[in-house]
Swiss-Prot record:
Keywords: Ribonucleoprotein, Ribosomal protein, RNA-binding, rRNA-binding. One of two assembly initiator proteins, it binds directly to the 5'-end of the 23S rRNA, where it nucleates assembly of the 50S subunit. The keyword rRNA-binding applies. The gene is rplX. This is Large ribosomal subunit protein uL24. The keyword Transport does not apply. It comes from the Bacteria. PANTHER family: MITOCHONDRIAL RIBOSOMAL PROTEIN L24. Coiled coil: none annotated. It comes from Rickettsia akari (strain Hartford).
Length: 109
């Protein structure tokens, strides 16, 4: 299993495939499959039968895409960037954008 550098809530851009160029936030991460669900990307229409809980109909939902098809958005420039890990002076480990050196987020829960 690969260590993922993406977390829920990260801003990403799709860099390849049918949805190339679309931006969105990560809604859910599937580390065992190396896939993520990005808001507004890879939308499909699903037909549901009526049941006791809902009336049924056609719903639109996002499907997972592979993490190799996305890149983080640099918070400083807005361009796609790779992510590196860096230890700060206080001992905490953070994720930083390689292009600008801007901090993306802390590592851990």
């Amino acid at each position: 299993m690969v260590k993922l550098k993406v977390r829920k809530g990260d801003e990403v851009i799709v860099i390849t495939g049918k949805h190339k160029g679309k931006k969105g936030k990560i809604l859910k991460v599937f580390p065992e499959d190396s896939k993520v669900i990005v808001a507004g990307v890879n939308l499909v229409k699903k037909h549901t039968k009526p049941n006791q809980m809902s009336g049924g109909g056609i719903i639109t939902k996002e499907l997972p895409i592979h993490i190799s098809n996305i890149a983080h958005i640099d918070p400083k420039t807005g361009d796609p960037t790779k992510v590196a890990f860096k230890c700060l002076d206080d001992g905490s480990k953070v994720r930083v954008a390689k292009k600008s050196g801007e901090i993306i987020g802390k590592v851990g829960k």
